[in-house]
């Protein structure tokens, strides 16, 4: 039987493999519960592609775990939530993205946890909320909501009002990701604000379909407005 260290090496070899399509399939040859730890480590990797492949891998592994034993998958989801809690002492890098990816691939987990993901971008005047103040974490939450919206727009729709506020954020990546999410939700009430961003040439990076690409807020705003019909 492979040791935890051996499995971590195997997981990272797959995440770093030039043939990632094949690597994804090989993840299932490993004991899934022992894959989870290395995947959490991958979310902090200095190589952005390894981090994003880790996110993708979570979306493969945890739904498979849920189908076999729902409580084991819930434990993983609760670990993400704890990592984003101030009391955890950690940062929670990659946690919102992984949550969104998992929920896009498993309806029951999405039903249980989508509101938690959406509330990460909801700020109240009292401050009694789970709003993520760190812009990089908030980017992750908006990307996660956009990924959820790709598969389950009706669940992501609860974030519509907060996403419209994000369209005015000073962070260009947040503005672009909000457009992506709102377009997928088909949020007609966001049309006028997104139309204002059609001339926003700010550059940003976007992960999707297994690749990191460069795009602009303008491109994402234009696509989102077009999606509204």
Model-derived features: where do they sit?
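N-terminal alpha-helical scaffold/docking segments in eukaryotic complex subunits
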Residues: 1-66, 215-229
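Alpha-helix N-cap/helix-start positions at coil->helix boundaries
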Residues: 17, 33, 48-49, 89-90, ...
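Conserved hydrophobic register position within alpha-solenoid helical repeats
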Residues: 23, 54, 95, 141, ...
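Structural signature of alpha-helical solenoid repeat scaffolds
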Residues: 59-62, 100-101, 142, 146-147, ...
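Hydrophobic/aromatic-rich structural module bridging two neighboring secondary-structure elements via a short loop
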Residues: 69-100
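Histidine/lysine/aspartate-rich catalytic loop segments that bind and position anionic ligands
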Residues: 114-152
């Amino acid at each position: 039987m492979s040791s935890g260290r051996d499995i971590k090496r195997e997981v990272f070899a797959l995440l770093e493999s030039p043939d990632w399509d094949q690597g994804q399939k090989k993840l299932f040859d490993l004991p899934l519960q022992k894959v989870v730890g290395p995947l959490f480590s991958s979310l902090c990797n200095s190589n952005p592609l390894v981090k994003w492949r880790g996110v993708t891998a979570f979306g493969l592994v945890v739904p498979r775990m849920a189908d076999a034993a729902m409580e084991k998958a819930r434990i993983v989801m609760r670990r993400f939530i704890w990592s984003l809690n101030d009391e955890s002492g950690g940062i929670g890098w990659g946690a919102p993205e992984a949550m969104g990816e998992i929920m896009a691939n498993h309806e029951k987990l999405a039903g249980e946890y989508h509101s938690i993901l959406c509330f990460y971008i909801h700020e109240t005047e009292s401050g009694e909320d789970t709003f993520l103040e760190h812009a990089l974490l908030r980017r992750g939450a908006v990307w996660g909501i956009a990924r959820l919206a790709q598969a389950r727009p009706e669940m992501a729709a609860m974030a519509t009002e907060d996403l419209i506020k994000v369209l005015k954020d000073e962070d260009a990546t947040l503005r672009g990701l909000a457009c992506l999410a709102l377009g997928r939700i088909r949020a007609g009430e966001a049309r006028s604000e997104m139309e204002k961003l059609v001339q926003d040439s700010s550059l940003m990076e976007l992960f999707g379909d297994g690749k990191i690409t460069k795009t602009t807020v303008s491109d994402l705003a234009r696509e989102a407005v077009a999606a509204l019909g």
